[in-house]
């Protein structure tokens, strides 16, 4: 594998085949799937994470689903309603950034749930016109690169 883009190539093939088959069987196309959600993030979330969860392996996890929804709008031209409801996914990198930026304390990083950390970001960004998920890529890369750029 030259670029190692798929860390589990056989599993990823099965995962995306399952997702494609689910979309085709239930809606006929990705466009119809989005239309069935009324272009609403909350309805789309319910379809993927609850009603048809088994048909969306990998994608139904909160972190991946939120980021996929963001990518649909950012690069796919899908204008979803309720984008402000797409929370940041506090993985290790986002949690570390949250501490460095003072969104949470080091102790809170060890005790707060992912949902509580996500809520802190939502509250911190209120009124800024920046959605929490928009913060994910720059924060993730900042932490991933060892906080190379200092504030």
Language-model segments: residues:
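HhH-family (HhH-GPD) DNA N-glycosylase catalytic core used in base-excision repair
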Residues: 1-151
